[in-house]
């Protein structure tokens, strides 16, 4: 049987020289959602350098193997890829890119109740309404 991941709080994290292939991933599996996660007060320094075409990729489902970021290939989001999840909050998350990255900041798939608050990209406020 599949376990659950819920009621998670991660805060006050700094990430440097992040491999932009994988960005950040919150991914459950079909029928087993990750729920009630809050990520706050985070700074992520990415390498960047990916294209708009990379943003069109759909990572494979890999529910039979241990979850490692490489198993999905290049992720279609430059910030967070959120799949099979519910009630996720990103608050005061700040992204910095060494090189331009053409992918969207956030990509969601089978995800609901996702909240973005106080998000910046290279020091500029990110409009989450779009």
Task: Say what each PLM segment does.
Residues 1-130:
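Extracellular/periplasmic carbohydrate-active domains that bind, remodel
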């Amino acid at each position: 049987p599949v376990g659950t991941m819920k009621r998670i709080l991660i805060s006050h994290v700094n990430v440097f020289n992040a491999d932009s292939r994988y960005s950040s991933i919150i991914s459950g599996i079909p029928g087993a959602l990750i729920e009630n996660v809050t990520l706050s007060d985070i700074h992520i320094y990415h390498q960047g350098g990916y294209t708009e075409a990379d943003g069109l990729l759909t990572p494979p489902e890999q529910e039979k193997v241990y979850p490692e970021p490489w198993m999905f290939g290049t992720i279609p989001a430059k910030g967070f890829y959120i799949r099979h999840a519910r009630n996720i909050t990103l608050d005061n998350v700040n992204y910095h890119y060494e090189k331009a990255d053409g992918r969207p900041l956030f990509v969601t798939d089978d995800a609901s109740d996702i909240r973005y608050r106080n998000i910046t990209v290279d020091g500029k406020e990110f409009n989450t309404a779009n």
